[in-house]
Amino acid sequence: MSQAVQTNGTQPLSKTWELSLYELQRTPQEAITDGLEIVVSPRSLHSELMCPICLDMLKNTMTTKECLHRFCADCIITALRSGNKECPTCRKKLVSKRSLRPDPNFDALISKIYPSRDEYEAHQERVLARINKHNNQQALSHSIEEGLKIQAMNRLQRGKKQQIENGSGAEDNGDSSHCSNASTHSNQEAGPSNKRTKTSDDSGLELDNNNAAMAIDPVMDGASEIELVFRPHPTLMEKDDSAQTRYIKTSGNATVDHLSKYLAVRLALEELRSKGESNQMNLDTASEKQYTIYIATASGQFTVLNGSFSLELVSEKYWKVNKPMELYYAPTKEHK
């Protein structure tokens, strides 16, 4: 294609536009007039309607004037404010919001394809909530299993240490038969050491063979830790394997509902192990509503604790003693 252009009344300048082979061969697309419907897969359609920044469906679409890429209004404005003033897709320079223009036609197209946009977003939120809940259950059960393993290792090391101490004590007693002065001196040294060992064992709230203990990480850095003695209710709990005294050390920010949920998951896990099952469905159904937490008052009565109370608040309101707080648990009547 050739074209001559006259400039300034002098000699004409010729411009030549060379067409590619594709441009020479292409023909206009025929309009569909017979009601033909073209099927498009939702996945390919969603990729066209997706914001490259948040990877969700476009909302309040904004189009760049230079490269014509589309983004959500909030996403692209935030990217320009905190980024390098460039298109997130092609890295073309965008000076400011003046390089963007709203695209109401594309928003209208999305509303035609998805007339129930609110229902779609509500469904997405429900799916995400279900996934997060499942992941939290798995993390909790994994934390309990790891805690049990660590406690078993500590128990084994304590047993070996006691055997070594007992053996060394027997050797000291054998040597004392030959020298009374040496035995008196050794007994004076061994007495305080044994006393210190016993004191540390009593104050450590460590795990027995029949009792279960669980150390829960603090919810927030710097939060005070509270030691609990978790006993079965003396009248509302049946005498079975699950009715054990449990020792817990956790954050003061933890609530009573957290304790109830931990207890439900812990007992469900112990039941699975006792039956030799590997099905984790019981853990998914564990709820904080299965167990009610009580505290004994000065009058000997048991007071039901509100599930939203933090353990620090319970300690300040009911306990007020500088020793591990004693709580009691029993199945909720509705879940018996």
Curated annotation (Swiss-Prot):
> Where are the residues of the annotated region Interaction with HIP2?
2-179
Q: In which pathway does it act?
A: Protein modification; protein ubiquitination
Which class of enzymes does this protein belong to?
Answer: transferase
Q: Where is this region: Disordered?
A: 157-208
Modified positions (Phosphoserine) in chain numbering: S41, S143, S168
- Per UniProt, the ranges with Polar residues bias are 176-191
Which taxonomic lineage is given here? Eukaryota, Metazoa, Chordata, Craniata, Vertebrata
Origin, by domain of life? Eukaryota
Q: Where, subcellularly, is it found? A: Nucleus; Cytoplasm; Chromosome
- What name does this protein carry? E3 ubiquitin-protein ligase RING2
Q: What is the effect of changing Y262A?
A: Reduced interaction with CBX7
Mutation: H69Y; reported impact is: Loss of HIP2-binding and loss of ubiquitin ligase activity on histone H2A
> Which disease is given in the protein's UniProt record?
Luo-Schoch-Yamamoto syndrome: An autosomal dominant disorder characterized by intrauterine growth retardation, severe intellectual disability, behavioral problems, early-onset seizures, feeding difficulties, and dysmorphic features. White matter abnormalities and delayed myelination are observed on brain imaging.
EC number(s)?
A: 2.3.2.27
Q: Which residue stretches are annotated zinc finger (RING-type)?
A: 51-91
In its UniProt entry, the species of origin is given as: Homo sapiens
Q: Where is this region: Interaction with nucleosomes via an acidic patch on histone H2A and histone H2B?
A: 93-98
The listed outcome for S41 to A/D is: No effect on ubiquitin ligase activity on histone H2A
Annotated catalysed reactions: S-ubiquitinyl-[E2 ubiquitin-conjugating enzyme]-L-cysteine + [acceptor protein]-L-lysine = [E2 ubiquitin-conjugating enzyme]-L-cysteine + N(6)-ubiquitinyl-[acceptor protein]-L-lysine
Provide the alphabetized UniProt keywords. Answer: Acetylation, Chromosome, Cytoplasm, Disease variant, Epilepsy, Intellectual disability, Isopeptide bond, Metal-binding, Nucleus, Phosphoprotein, Repressor, Transcription, Transcription regulation, Transferase, Ubl conjugation, Ubl conjugation pathway, Zinc, Zinc-finger
